[in-house]
From Swiss-Prot:
Residues 72-135 form the S5 DRBM domain. The keyword rRNA-binding applies. This is Small ribosomal subunit protein uS5. SUPFAM superfamilies: dsRNA-binding domain-like (SSF54768), Ribosomal protein S5 domain 2-like (SSF54211). With S4 and S12 plays an important role in translational accuracy. One of its GO terms (cellular component) is small ribosomal subunit. The keyword Disulfide bond does not apply. Belongs to the universal ribosomal protein uS5 family. Part of the 30S ribosomal subunit. Contacts proteins S4 and S8. It comes from Mycoplasmoides gallisepticum (strain R(low / passage 15 / clone 2)) (Mycoplasma gallisepticum). Residues 1-71 are annotated as: Disordered.
Amino acid sequence: MEDIKHNKKPNTNNSAETKKASGANPQANHANPNNRSASVNNNSVNNNKKNSSRSSDERNKRKNEKRTKSEFEEKIVKISRISKTTKGGRTMRFSALVVVGDRKGRVGFGIAKALEVPNAIKKALKMAENNVQKIAMNKHGTLFHDVLGRSGAAKVLIKPAPSGTGIIAGGAIRAVVELAGFTDVYTKNMGKNTPINMVRATMDGITSQYTPRQIAKLRSKSLKEL
């Protein structure tokens, strides 16, 4: 009987040790999930910050686009279709000629090509906005003097007109003159009527003006002496 009792005691000790070990392991196992949840929360916060910054950037871009749209007025002068023959066949593309201006002395034009008409217009608008130039005009809304613009085989004559005359022009010339802000001018096409060359010739003419101050500096005189 004594031998049997001695054999039972080691079993109780082993069970106590296993209980202690099993009691310690669950604590360790519970500690790791807490650390993981904390790291997950930190990652989610960082992702939320990134998403908020991206959304704010997109909002700023939309605001800038709205400003540019409200700032400039646009006119589509011509949309033409272009075909190109290759080994694989014919490829169709479209070109768009667009003029933009604020009717306050700033005007520009752009021409672009794309596979679709809307994309060609968007590209042309961006080019036109980047190529905006400041145009000189007097307080009556007309030119200071006669100008002759040239581009290729196109020649455009532009003259100042008295108030109330209006814009005597048509086609591509009218689009440029109107969006520049002129209200009374005479124009005449003296060459070929290719739209792109007419636009360039008109821009060449209205940007080659001399204001009274510039003439006074060239002649080394004051404005009163002129």
